[in-house]
Amino acid sequence: MLFIFNFLFSPLPTPALICILTFGAAIFLWLITRPQPVLPLLDLNNQSVGIEGGARKGVSQKNNDLTSCCFSDAKTMYEVFQRGLAVSDNGPCLGYRKPNQPYRWLSYKQVSDRAEYLGSCLLHKGYKSSPDQFVGIFAQNRPEWIISELACYTYSMVAVPLYDTLGPEAIVHIVNKADIAMVICDTPQKALVLIGNVEKGFTPSLKVIILMDPFDDDLKQRGEKSGIEILSLYDAENLGKEHFRKPVPPSPEDLSVICFTSGTTGDPKGAMITHQNIVSNAAAFLKCVEHAYEPTPDDVAISYLPLAHMFERIVQAVVYSCGARVGFFQGDIRLLADDMKTLKPTLFPAVPRLLNRIYDKVQNEAKTPLKKFLLKLAVSSKFKELQKGIIRHDSFWDKLIFAKIQDSLGGRVRVIVTGAAPMSTSVMTFFRAAMGCQVYEAYGQTECTGGCTFTLPGDWTSGHVGVPLACNYVKLEDVADMNYFTVNNEGEVCIKGTNVFKGYLKDPEKTQEALDSDGWLHTGDIGRWLPNGTLKIIDRKKNIFKLAQGEYIAPEKIENIYNRSQPVLQIFVHGESLRSSLVGVVVPDTDVLPSFAAKLGVKGSFEELCQNQVVREAILEDLQKIGKESGLKTFEQVKAIFLHPEPFSIENGLLTPTLKAKRGELSKYFRTQIDSLYEHIQD
């Protein structure tokens, strides 16, 4: 007993004391620096609840009131930007760079002032401060795009984005449909397209073109011959400064943008989006992640996804509402990695196509068995931490395996949001493990202003698109033709809320097809409520067709399954009502096909491999195997395929600007090959 007393209360030797203090300091340092888990704030087994009428809402939404805004002083996009100016204390707003140079920044006040000057110029040129006054914006992502858009909002006008890749016919359609008299564009080349349409008598309403980039006198003179005034953006802003008008801010219910959707068939439809639509969607995102991620003026987003798409518009609304910054890529997607390393963004909006490319590159670099083993072990270890809510990028595996990937995206990413297309479980799991940041998946479409469901913080499972956002309800409706019934928690996804658009511009027939009499938006997607209350997109109602024997076919569902085949980069599944079977056009993966063929004992150039019968039959066999494993019925399997060496792309007219297959164009383009495949089957 005396020994214990002496041990406890006798002075310790200096070395022992130092050891104890060092150990204590280490424990204290670990306690204050250890990663704080991002834990769910609700029961992940019960993420949404039913309400009257068969719809569902997120369980965190305590009442049935739908979110319309996050901040009382930011109910329109004009107010959102002014709030950003205030909370950032006129901090940096829009960043741009030239090759091999750092980013240069325009402050919030500079952007606001330039928007007021440009808007004043529009009024001086005869435009009115009215939500039925449409201004075209025909440019790639850059600061002047935002200045042009904000100029519209500052004076209650409506922005009408034109896609870079829409093509001349669609541009004619949009200019005429929206009766656009003025277009703000970036390059002389685009101005020539617009002038050419006027010269041919296609777009008589167009009277003024404002150009961001320098242009020569020849362009101006050519425009004048067609009755078009050509102005530089610099001169337009100076003109507006001389004839300044006070801002005429819009109301939340006023139109903000006409977003023309890239239809897979027919002319683009102009979705009428209000200020409240955009603000409510951005507010719902902030509400969804409020305890896990709170944007600050120190945050930076990279802008490379088209500003003509609502996904990118919502991201930027979130950024400006919190006084954060947006850095624009140089305009060349091949330089995006360099832009990100320079910008070091904290918010990274992404699409599966880009993430898949990064994922494939990492997988291909892990060539040896040891590298593959270490990569798999690293992902598994990090994902186990993630399941406990621990998100970090300073672990042993980060330093050994993932640092290079993180650095390629700038090394500071806090949040990745992916949308626009389904994300595979393997890719989602990889990025959640590798990036050491929060990775969320969103689902929606233009007509609901970009998003209607979102995965929740703390739920790091994959294979679903989350729960309804606080700005909308979601319900399913029976699709009897496809054997989907709500009694089985399956059906067409329908949306109602403050984010649902007002209809299609001057197209009541298409509007009635999309919006029913009760205000529900019918998406054309087939969803399933999972037991935990999350939504899974399982099929597509549109683009279905019937085979000769009466069986309904949803080709996109089949294509999504076949895309899991390693040698397949793209696939188009085709069927006809007078035919009893399906055929397909496959674009092989240039990185995979040579090794795939080598295992079959076949060598040659990529084009030669595409023409090789042994290779073609092996790929067909692989497709049918994957289809069977995935539950495809016999009539849903392709019976013959053609291997095409050139990818489907926007440039060759086979994909829409949102990278969806133009099924009608594909059928026409491959008509000869399709007929040959059917003849082969009959033989």
From Swiss-Prot:
GO annotation terms (biological process): long-chain fatty acid metabolic process; long-chain fatty-acyl-CoA biosynthetic process; positive regulation of long-chain fatty acid import across plasma membrane; regulation of extrinsic apoptotic signaling pathway
* Keyword Cell membrane appears in the UniProt entry: yes
Location(s) in or outside the cell:
Mitochondrion; Endoplasmic reticulum; Mitochondrion outer membrane; Endoplasmic reticulum membrane
Per the UniProt topology annotation, the Cytoplasmic ranges are 33-683
Taxonomically, the superkingdom here is: Eukaryota
| Enzyme Commission number(s) of this protein | 6.2.1.3, 6.2.1.15
Q: Known PANTHER family for this protein?
A: LONG-CHAIN-FATTY-ACID--COA LIGASE (PTHR43272), LONG-CHAIN-FATTY-ACID--COA LIGASE 5 (PTHR43272:SF107)
- The modified positions for N6-acetyllysine read 361
User: What is its biological role?
Assistant: Catalyzes the conversion of long-chain fatty acids to their active form acyl-CoAs for both synthesis of cellular lipids, and degradation via beta-oxidation. ACSL5 may activate fatty acids from exogenous sources for the synthesis of triacylglycerol destined for intracellular storage. Utilizes a wide range of saturated fatty acids with a preference for C16-C18 unsaturated fatty acids. It was suggested that it may also stimulate fatty acid oxidation.
Which cofactors does the annotated protein need, by name?
Mg(2+)
List GO molecular-function terms, semicolon-separated: arachidonate-CoA ligase activity; ATP binding; long-chain fatty acid-CoA ligase activity; oleoyl-CoA ligase activity
> What membrane topology does this protein have?
Single-pass type III membrane protein
Which disorder is recorded?
A: Diarrhea 13: An autosomal recessive disorder characterized by neonatal onset of recurrent vomiting and diarrhea, leading to severe failure to thrive.
Q: Which UniProt keywords apply?
A: Acetylation, ATP-binding, Cell membrane, Disease variant, Endoplasmic reticulum, Fatty acid metabolism, Ligase, Lipid metabolism, Magnesium, Membrane, Mitochondrion, Mitochondrion outer membrane, Nucleotide-binding, Phosphoprotein, Signal-anchor, Transmembrane, Transmembrane helix
Q: Identify its protein family.
A: Belongs to the ATP-dependent AMP-binding enzyme family.
Question: Mutating residue 388 to R leads to what result?
Answer: In a colorectal cancer sample; somatic mutation
Q: Which GO terms describe its cellular component?
A: endoplasmic reticulum; endoplasmic reticulum membrane; membrane; mitochondrial outer membrane; mitochondrion; nucleolus; nucleoplasm; plasma membrane
Substrates-to-products reaction catalysed = a long-chain fatty acid + ATP + CoA = a long-chain fatty acyl-CoA + AMP + diphosphate; (5Z,8Z,11Z,14Z)-eicosatetraenoate + ATP + CoA = (5Z,8Z,11Z,14Z)-eicosatetraenoyl-CoA + AMP + diphosphate; hexadecanoate + ATP + CoA = hexadecanoyl-CoA + AMP + diphosphate; (E)-hexadec-2-enoate + ATP + CoA = (2E)-hexadecenoyl-CoA + AMP + diphosphate
Q: What is this protein called?
A: Long-chain-fatty-acid--CoA ligase 5
Question: Which spans are transmembrane here?
Answer: 12-32
Pfam families found in the cross-reference section: AMP-binding (PF00501)
